[in-house]
């Protein structure tokens, strides 16, 4: 049971609701790209992102404390035609009836997509460009066969990154990041191909930062508008706090635990609008959030109970995000999973134990709301407190499948063997599903997933699928003819 009526109500809506396709982001992205033909790709993408931040509806749902949504629905499944649109066109007429991960999509939305979105992207999507570069027989194996799962890697973005809250995002905020990029842009002369590319990058950073800051401003304005007409004084106070939080973050460094929670969600939401990437990991949440928690509790601004409610609200936000995938991908990755791996516990950079009050709150929030996100991981070391081990065991005993338990020393050793410094290796977090990872580096842990069982099947069945009879493998002879 959730810690409050608020989070329990949101949890029930999450559990019993079916995600709905939103065409808004795709429509904005398409119109922006029509307007920026001929400009550098990073700049075009940044302008499309900024347009989405400025035009998508700023919706605050009843009772919310953490705000921000990628479409007009609480669980919006957005489309990414610049990555891939052909599978959506083939499958969207049966989205609501497929057995795994169905989506609601109206006839009007389908007609709009086919008339106003797909025509522009025909021949321009990442999918089409990628498949054209491959031999035909190879390309055929990569799409919806269950033999080589490659299509899930380019129908939506694969993130496999951990935002650096400790050293970049929280200390600077997006305004300072923007100003630094603008300074680099001004200092970089357009006198070489390399510098022209650098200028495009810096320009795109400026535009993207302006976009995410404007998105937050719009939520602040909407919260203020709702507060002005709110009759309930308690809810009015909450809306005013939301307005203040969104006026502050993510443009500026957070000052309170609530601001830090909202900052984290704006980072996730920005990535959703940009690429909808899976495996965008919140990282070592209990480490970078604890200073705000401790300061607020000491100052009397926050109670552990209120902190738990805020974390539950954030967990629900993580779970409302929808990874829009094909029916074939859903057969293997069912559950609307985004693989947002959040890690608690483990050693600090100096080698001391990092378990704190927030580590326990994260466990309790996961047990309370019972959401599928974030993917909660715990790091267990030889000096882990017994109380934390018992709390982890209690959560495991509920049968939820959380948390994933990882050997702290093994994770650090893997990064040491990869060449990381000891302090960085000790600061590892889990990435996606699942690999030890450090927040200052990106990863690409799998360009394709190989079904070795299918390889054996084709070898023993003359290169043909036992499901369809289609010859997809090498034309091997019958097994009884093997020497």
Model-based region annotation:
Residues 2-205, 234-241, 245-483:
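Conserved catalytic cores of very large enzyme subunits
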Residues 203-214:
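Extended non-globular scaffold/tether segments
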Residues 226-234:
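A conserved hydrophobic secondary-structure block that centers on an alpha-helix together
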């Amino acid at each position: 049971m959730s810690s409050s009526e608020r989070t329990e109500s949101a949890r029930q809506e999450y559990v019993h609701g079916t995600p709905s396709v939103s065409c808004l982001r795709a429509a904005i992205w398409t119109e922006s790209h029509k307007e920026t033909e001929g400009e550098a790709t990073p700049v075009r993408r940044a302008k499309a992102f900024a347009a989405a931040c400025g035009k998508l509806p700023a919706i605050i749902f009843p009772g919310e404390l953490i705000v921000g949504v990628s479409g007009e629905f609480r669980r919006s499944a957005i489309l990414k035609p610049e990555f891939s649109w052909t599978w959506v066109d083939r499958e969207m007429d049966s989205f609501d009836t497929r057995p795994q991960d169905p989506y609601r999509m109206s006839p009007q939305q389908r007609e709009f997509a086919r008339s106003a979105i797909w025509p522009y992207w025909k021949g321009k999507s990442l999918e089409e460009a990628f498949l054209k570069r491959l031999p035909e027989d190879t390309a055929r194996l990569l799409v919806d066969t269950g033999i080589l799962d490659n299509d899930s890697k380019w129908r939506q973005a694969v993130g496999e990154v951990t935002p650096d809250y400790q050293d970049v995002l929280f200390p600077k905020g997006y305004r300072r990041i923007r100003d630094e990029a603008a300074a680099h842009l001004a200092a970089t002369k357009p006198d070489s191909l390399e510098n022209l590319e650098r200028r495009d990058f810096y320009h795109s950073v400026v535009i993207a930062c302006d976009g995410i800051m404007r998105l937050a401003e719009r939520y602040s304005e909407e919260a203020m508008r709702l507060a002005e007409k709110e009759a309930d004084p308690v809810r009015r106070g909450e809306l005013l706090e939301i307005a203040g939080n969104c006026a502050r973050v993510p443009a500026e460094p957070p000052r309170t635990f609530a601001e830090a929670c909202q900052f984290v969600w704006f980072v996730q939401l920005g990535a959703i609008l940009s690429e909808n990437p899976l495996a965008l990991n919140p990282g070592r949440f209990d480490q970078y959030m604890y200073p705000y928690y401790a300061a607020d509790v000491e100052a009397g601004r926050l109670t552990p109970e209120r902190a738990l409610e805020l974390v539950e609200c954030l967990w629900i936000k993580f779970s409302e995000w929808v990874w829009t995938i094909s029916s074939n991908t859903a057969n293997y990755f069912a559950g609307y999973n985004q693989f947002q791996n959040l890690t608690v516990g483990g050693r600090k950079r100096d080698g001391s134990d990092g378990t704190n009050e927030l580590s326990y709150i994260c466990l309790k929030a996961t047990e309370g709301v019972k959401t599928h996100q974030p993917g909660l991981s715990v790091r267990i070391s030889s000096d882990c407190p017994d109380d934390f081990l018992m709390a982890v065991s209690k959560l495991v005993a509920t049968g939820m499948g959380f948390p994933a338990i990882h050997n702290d020393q093994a994770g650090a050793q893997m990064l040491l063997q990869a060449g990381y410094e000891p302090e960085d290796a000790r600061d590892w977090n889990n990435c996606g599903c699942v690999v030890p990872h450090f927040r200052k580096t990106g990863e690409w842990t799998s360009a394709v997933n190989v079904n070795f069982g299918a390889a054996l099947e084709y070898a023993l069945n003359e290169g043909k699928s036992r499901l369809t009879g289609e010859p997809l493998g090498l034309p091997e002879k019958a097994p009884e003819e093997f020497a």
